[in-house]
């Protein structure tokens, strides 16, 4: 007679096996930021500064015109999602600037 398991039906029924764990495909890693590309982007940002539209958007964010800044950036970058990401990035930069200024004083 076969070995009996506590469950005859349901999710836990049948022969217990160990799951075969596979590594994710290399083609799935696209879009993930590497250390090197982050370093290069930071270096470029330090050397070149901000584009004129980014400076104007930052001015709008400084005076709490978030919606107007989003509409302005969307017009420049093309899509709503990219605009939201850019607005978030610029507001984080402004917060870091404020933090650095407060630390300096």
Swiss-Prot record:
GO terms for cellular component: cytosol; ribonucleoprotein complex; ribosome. It is found in: Cytoplasm, Cytosol; Cytoplasm. InterPro entries: Ribosomal_eL36, Ribosomal_eL36_sf. It holds the Pfam family Ribosomal_L36e. The keyword Ribosomal protein applies. Residues 14-36 are annotated as: Disordered. One of its GO terms (biological process) is translation. PROSITE patterns: RIBOSOMAL_L36E. The keyword Hydrolase does not apply. Keywords: Cytoplasm, Ribonucleoprotein, Ribosomal protein. Coiled coil: none annotated. GO terms for molecular function: structural constituent of ribosome. Belongs to the eukaryotic ribosomal protein eL36 family. Component of the large ribosomal subunit. PANTHER family: 60S RIBOSOMAL PROTEIN L36 (PTHR10114). Component of the large ribosomal subunit. The ribosome is a large ribonucleoprotein complex responsible for the synthesis of proteins in the cell. This is Large ribosomal subunit protein eL36. It comes from Ictalurus punctatus.
């Amino acid at each position: 007679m076969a070995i009996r398991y506590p469950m005859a039906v349901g999710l836990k029924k049948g022969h217990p096996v160990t799951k075969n764990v596979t590594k994710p495909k290399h083609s799935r890693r696209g879009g993930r930021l590497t250390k090197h590309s982050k370093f290069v982007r930071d270096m470029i940002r330090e050397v070149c500064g901000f584009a004129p539209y980014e400076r104007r958007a930052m001015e709008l964010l400084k005076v709490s015109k978030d919606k107007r800044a989003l509409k302005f950036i969307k017009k420049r970058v093309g899509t709503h999602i990219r605009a939201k990401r850019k607005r978030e990035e610029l507001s984080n930069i402004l917060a870091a600037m404020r933090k650095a200024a407060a630390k300096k004083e």
